[in-house]
């Protein structure tokens, strides 16, 4: 029998050994679970220490987990809500912290869901053991802590900034370096989101790998923790050994900038277009019509070497040129008939006339924008004088289309639209005058630009002083006038009189979305503004500074887009970090010239139209057949809806009256209203994408081709009626041609003359090539029958 004291000692010894072993096991387990381990990332990068803000939240964003359709939505998903696009690290850490297990990282609810080990509506976001998984696991195992402010980026750099491929079918690696507020610099390439703008030119692989596909240029937008950079991609055309770039005429700095880019891409521009091609294009682009057969013959026969420049000057001074641009600017500035007071269509006409008159006398863009952006109703007039002028205006508007509104110094209708709030007018102003889309910042930080919700609200507050109603000075006169109007017969009653005025002392304010404190008015990327005076005027002065990065560049880009079918920045109202210009040297040269010339619109137009670049043929050569953005040739493009109507009528030789929508003898391009009464005109406008002018961005209208447009031109009864009753009927009526055509006895020479006249009217050139083309492309030719 064992001695009891010895037994007790033995038991105690064994117990202590087991306890020690257990303690060691726990310690080893803890060490295994918490000791930082190097993580191998794509591209051979070693991550020594995982940071919540820099790495974990970057993976969350890269996987799309904090997007608007997932956990970043306002209500979240499955009870789990993150800040949209990761704008709030503190909120995100609190939400994620509830779904991790620091004692057993692999058993964390977050990882089980993301790897689909547990049911997940968002599917599998990454696999167990992947580098993304290891980033999460390592951070959880370390305790799931957050170092506040560690992810504040002060600079994001793409290396290289321009990727120059040797040709299609090769690869290159982008590297992204982030500099943080604490001074550290890190290769964050695996944590970035990459998006290629044109995947025809290049496609993306994993982790910033880019493969060239076809000749051209594009950009890759790189996003990391809400910061955006873009890298330019150039893929030159393959050329034969010994290729020598040809010489051709350089007319002005436009041609030099375009030539410089084309040489980098081994792209040769098309030849200069023929006289017929030039005349038709310039007439459509400047006055929204086509030349008559007589004009074509006279221009082709003219031997003056300056005839193109003379024709350009002639057309730029044509009243229809101002009307065309007044229609374009009506779309840009939001001349929406439905948002105006009665008589709505006439007020749209006033808006259009105000723009047209200034364009006719070639007022500078700065002057035009000043009249819009800083507009008030009374100006310097006394209330009684203004009330009298308003009554005269209302009476003239009811009687016809002509009023004296265009003589007013400012366009107060821009601010007098109904149901347009502070946010909407700020979005419209940013897009129209700065070329910047701020709409998405109403709810969250812009995913591909630098703008935040605070930037958005600070800019909106610039316009918070503008009121519509009755100012203290004019209140008595306005109330008396409205009482008088109320007593008028119903069918003669004018709308309630309201003035647009500035109320410096009691502005509307949007608060900071985080602190709920008032935000001072501020220009986008510019200074805070003094609230003691009209902040709109201060904004305008900032816009007109020569070094302003938006105002001049945005408008010359719109001019370029009008004449080429696409902007140097495209879309034209999307100047952003993630959407760089295709040719920044060209854009900067145009903008600098525009500012130096006092914002002279016609000067820029004249330069563009006289350039070889604009006058190139639409026929491609073997080097530029794939070009879509470097202006190596003229790009075929659709016309504005009103121009389609006018061109069709001019080509067919018919006059269409729009008596319900425009004065007698006016064209569709002079119809100001968006609510059109003429049924045929309304139908054509709808089919050809006429802008409703209800949206702040240029996406509201469309000039893209569609099946409905093709069917309209082929089968619409109104089109067929104009064909039968227009120029063709007139030509066939000469000498009984119609009867002899029906009898099959018409002479060949007579029929050729008819074809020639119709082709000159429609295409601006001799028809023979087109007749042969039509024959060999017919079913009768291509099929055996």
Where are these regions (language model features)?
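Long, His/Glu/Asp-enriched segments that create or flank divalent metal/ion-associated functional microenvironments
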Residues: 651-674, 678-714
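Bacterial N-terminal signal peptides
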Residues: 21-31
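Positively charged n-region of N-terminal signal peptides that target proteins for export
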Residues: 2, 13-19
